[in-house]
Amino acid sequence: MSQSAVSFQISPVSKTQDPLIQQKIDLKTKPPGALGQLESLALQIARVQATDSQQTDQPQNTVLKIVHPTMLVFAGDHGIAAEGVSIAPSEVTRQMVQNFAHGGAAINVFCRQVGFTLEVIDCGILTPVEGVEGIIDQRLGAGTGAIHLEPAMALETVDKGFAMARDLIERHHQAGCNLVAFGEMGIGNTSAAAAIMAAIMQLDVIDCVGRGTGINSETLERKLMLIELALLLHQSALTGPKSVLACLGGFEIVQMTGAMLAAAERKMLVVVDGFIATAAALVAVQIAPNVRDYLIFAHQSDEQGHQRMLEFLQAKPLLSLGLRLGEGTGAALALPLIQASVNFYNQMASFSDAGIEAVV
């Protein structure tokens, strides 16, 4: 049975109340703009939550909320990894998924610190982890095809992944969650992300490919060559964002893309992590441009090409820490800043409240 096409209906955020929202921000006890990027972030969050059909208050009375923040880490293996494009073999994907389940990875530590609930989704690692609680089975296969030799997956598999991702997001939405963050694990997935970037942005491969988690120059040359071969092989088939995912993507990238679209459809805030998650966001924006209104970009990673992709998406990340780990670590570290934006909007006194002469 073929998988029916999955579509998303995403409303743009309403900007009709921007003057009132901005006025509330400007009348806090500070010079205008003194909280920098936190102010533009508060405006974005207020727009999203004002767009929610359940929100009826005027901006001056609105209380912004972050409810049940959830980190979703999607894992999948890549056929191209067999060619040695990473510092680690594919087996490490499975080992790290086990590490996530046991609470021992960086993402576990950071989620515990900042208050994220963490879920790990097996989208298609080579060998499933059995007998370990805390891993959600949304497998689309046992690793993708090697993209320099064949498509990563069938087009129908992309839609199947989107449907699974929508169901996952719906479960969290029904539980009251209004902010989801996205991380990933998959040896070889920087190759897939770079190929997606090159295809969508029409760039030379050398402008998109980096050292991932730390490959040497010889491995980098091999990685460049294989991605160039992949783009040449699939050139005629790259007719739209879904075909880009089918030819060049990963099971985890597909489900991240679908989950971003589904979360925006439900008017949830979406926190995007690093290079691979941003590649998923790049595809999501091609599918439904309105999704961009809901995306918060956590950080600029140390991966070659990430800055260029962020600029293409007109995104200003919250952090720049030289991270190149993935897992959602940058997105986790951004949560306190997001909460700070919400808190100053809700709790900071206005000039009139404090009896201070306005400096607006």
From Swiss-Prot:
Catalytic activity from the UniProt record: 5,6-dimethylbenzimidazole + nicotinate beta-D-ribonucleotide = alpha-ribazole 5'-phosphate + nicotinate + H(+)
Record keywords, A-Z: Cobalamin biosynthesis, Glycosyltransferase, Transferase
Gene Ontology MF, one: nicotinate-nucleotide-dimethylbenzimidazole phosphoribosyltransferase activity
Organism of origin: Shewanella baltica (strain OS223)
BP term (GO), one: cobalamin biosynthetic process
Enzyme class: transferase
Protein name: Nicotinate-nucleotide--dimethylbenzimidazole phosphoribosyltransferase
Record EC number: 2.4.2.21
Pfam families: DBI_PRT
Entries under PANTHER family matching the protein: NICOTINATE-NUCLEOTIDE--DIMETHYLBENZIMIDAZOLE PHOSPHORIBOSYLTRANSFERASE
InterPro entries: Nict_dMeBzImd_PRibTrfase (IPR003200), Nict_dMeBzImd_PRibTrfase_bact (IPR017846), Nict_dMeBzImd_PRibTrfase_N (IPR023195), Nict_dMeBzImd_PRibTrfase_sf (IPR036087)
Pathway of action: Nucleoside biosynthesis; alpha-ribazole biosynthesis; alpha-ribazole from 5,6-dimethylbenzimidazole: step 1/2
Catalytic residues, chain numbering: 327
Highest taxon listed in the record's lineage: Bacteria
Protein family (similarity comment): Belongs to the CobT family.
Function: Catalyzes the synthesis of alpha-ribazole-5'-phosphate from nicotinate mononucleotide (NAMN) and 5,6-dimethylbenzimidazole (DMB).
